[in-house]
């Protein structure tokens, strides 16, 4: 895969991850803060943390691809 294709693929992956973050943030914001909702909120928090790590890795890979141009 060429550099331009790599960057395009990384951009697509970033967009998907960022869309998922926005959706999770919206869902978490809509849930009332009750004892019953804590497991769901914890699940959202774990997924958001994982997505943040994945997004950072994609950003690093994208920066490396740009540097290799």
Q: Which functions belong to the PLM regions below?
A:
Residues 3-5:
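Low-complexity, glycine/proline/serine-enriched flexible coil segments
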């Amino acid at each position: 895969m060429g550099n331009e294709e790599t960057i395009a693929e990384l951009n697509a992956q970033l967009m998907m991850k960022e869309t998922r973050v926005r959706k999770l943030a919206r869902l978490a914001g809509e849930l009332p803060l009750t004892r019953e909702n804590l497991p769901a909120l914890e699940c959202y928090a774990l997924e958001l943390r994982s997505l943040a790590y994945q997004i950072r890795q994609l950003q690093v890979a994208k920066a490396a691809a740009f540097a290799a141009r």
